[in-house]
Every structure is written in C-alpha cells, then in structure tokens.
Amino acid sequence: MLSVTWDRALAILLPGMPRAMEIKDVRNAMFVLAEKWPVTYGRAFQRALAFCARAIEGKCSASRARLAFLAAAREAKVAVVA
C-alpha cells in the first residue's frame, strides 16, 4: 500500500480562519476539502477529491494527491503559506 503521508507539510490560510492550518497527509487534505473548503465546485476541486480518495485506496501516490490539492488551492484562491 502506498503511503498517504506527504514528504512536506503544507500550511494554508482559509477564509475566516485566524491562523494557518497545517496539512500533513492525504487524509487531512481530504477532510479539509470535504468539510472546510471555501469553494465546493470546479475542476481542480473535483480532481483533488478524486486523487485524495485514490491515494487513500492505494491507487495513486500521496505526492500526486498533494499536487492536485495545490491546484485546488490555486483554483479557490486559498493561500498556501508554507
């Protein structure tokens, strides 16, 4: 089974949050996309959800899911601060 932990954590600043949120792995990214994400539509958002799910199932790498998460952040104008 592929690892769902990222080589490097990300820190994102979501609207309305007082400080940055650290995202360390695919499961955490999936939760943030599903429960906290400010924009729940768009191609990059859908792809990020799909790649996170695939990584959790062992069907793609965590690094691929991380790239998809970063694309969703760009699409939603979510600041990546680290």
Predicted regions and their residues:
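Short, charged/polar N-terminal "headpieces" of proteins
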Residues: 1-12
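A short, structured beta-strand/loop element
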Residues: 13-50
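Short, compact, well-ordered microdomains
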Residues: 52-82
